[in-house]
């Protein structure tokens, strides 16, 4: 990693005073001021939460990876942890029951999870009741923490992700909370196939999400995020490691499409491609495990990307995101597709 790999939102840890300079042999040769990487004067932290994704229970070391992450997050005193889908690899009863048993046995703080595309593979027609049974929450729901609202959206398939009812509910929830900070958790990033976007560095991952009639839903979903300026969108799906930012500025965080978008790698099998836009074959690191601890302040959040195996926070995945509230006038959202009843 070099200094040029950072983006404008990257910040040093709150406690950092200087940047160490090392030569190619790993020997420290000096230090420089933090400069633009200085942590802002943000005041006191309000609370923290965990943000992980793509557990894929039944694959490789997924169980031990999941337990390790839960144990660490509990020890770091997060208020709760959000899981951004793909709790299991196939979504069958055995895997979902195992997910529930691991959460029950290891999570000492609340877990708020949503369904990803892999969770729909067995019970597509009945996915809402299956997820409610094993994850202990409705298919889509809200959680409040102080003045903040967490909007949790499950998906029912890889094409059209939502029912009409869920998409309408999403609009109504954003409208009702338009002048509050809203953290939106939904599994799929906002790009179909190999469209380059946050979470799909250089378009190197092929995603089936948003295909077919899902294309219209994608238009609506993006327009909702862009209109309701106080929202921050968290997603997983591609598994791509944090280090891909070295090859693509928008790999992990982006706001160039009019909304704040945050990519969460896989907690159990992150992908470690070299960043080439032609590298679309999976290169899973089954020994790896990455995710976020998110520190919340009055006017911003500190995203702290972590390697759960090495036990380190990663400089390339440390971001300050300004969330100063903006006024959104009531009844001003317009849907060009006619999907949403306003």
For each feature predicted by the language model, list its residue ranges:
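Alpha/beta-hydrolase fold active-site loops
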Residues: 47, 79, 140, 147-148, ...
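A short C-terminal boundary segment appended to hydrolase-like catalytic domains
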Residues: 42-43, 281-342
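N-terminal active-site segment of His-dependent metallophosphoesterases
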Residues: 15, 22-97
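Short, intrinsically disordered N-terminal pre-domain segments
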Residues: 1-18, 301
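Active-site neighborhood of phospho(di)ester-bond hydrolases with catalytic His/Asp-centered motifs
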Residues: 51-53, 80-86, 110-117, 153, ...
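Short acidic, glycine-rich surface-loop motifs adjacent to enzyme active sites
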Residues: 84, 177-201
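Solvent-exposed loop/turn segments at secondary-structure junctions
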Residues: 55-58, 87-90, 117-121, 156-160, ...
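Extended active-site neighborhood of metal-dependent phosphoesterases/phosphodiesterases
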Residues: 93-178, 205-211, 216, 220-227, ...
């Amino acid at each position: 990693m070099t200094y040029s790999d950072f983006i404008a939102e990257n910040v040093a840890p709150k406690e950092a005073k200087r940047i160490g300079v090392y030569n190619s042999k790993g020997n420290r040769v000096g230090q420089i001021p933090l400069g633009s990487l200085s942590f802002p004067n943000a005041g006191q932290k309000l609370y923290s939460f965990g943000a992980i994704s793509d557990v894929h229970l039944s694959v490789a070391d997924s169980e031990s990876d999941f337990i390790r992450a839960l144990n660490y997050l509990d020890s770091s005193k997060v208020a709760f942890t959000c899981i951004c889908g793909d709790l299991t690899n196939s979504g069958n009863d055995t895997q979902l029951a195992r997910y529930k048993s691991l959460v029950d046995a290891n999570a000492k703080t609340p877990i708020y999870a949503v369904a990803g595309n892999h969770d729909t593979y067995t019970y597509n027609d009945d996915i809402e009741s299956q997820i409610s049974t094993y994850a202990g929450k409705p298919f889509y729901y809200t959680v409040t923490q102080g003045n903040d609202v967490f909007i949790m959206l499950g998906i029912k398939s890889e094409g059209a992700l939502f029912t009409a009812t869920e998409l309408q509910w999403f609009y109504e929830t954003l409208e009702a909370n338009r002048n509050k900070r809203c953290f939106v958790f939904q599994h799929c990033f906002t790009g179909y196939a190999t469209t380059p976007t946050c979470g799909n560095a250089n378009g190197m991952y092929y995603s089936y999400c948003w295909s077919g009639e899902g294309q219209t839903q994608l238009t609506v979903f993006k327009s909702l995020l862009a209109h309701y300026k106080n929202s921050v969108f968290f997603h997983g799906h591609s598994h791509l490691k944090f280090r891909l930012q070295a090859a693509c500025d928008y790999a992990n965080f982006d706001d160039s499409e009019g909304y704040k978008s945050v990519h969460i790698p896989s907690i159990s099998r992150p992908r470690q491609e070299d960043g080439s836009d032609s590298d679309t074959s999976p290169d899973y690191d089954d020994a790896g495990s990455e995710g976020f601890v998110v520190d919340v302040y009055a006017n911003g959040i500190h995203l702290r990307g972590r390697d759960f195996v090495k036990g380190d926070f990663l400089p390339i995945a440390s971001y300050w995101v300004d969330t100063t509230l903006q006024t959104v006038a009531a009844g001003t959202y317009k849907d060009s597709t006619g999907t949403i009843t306003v």
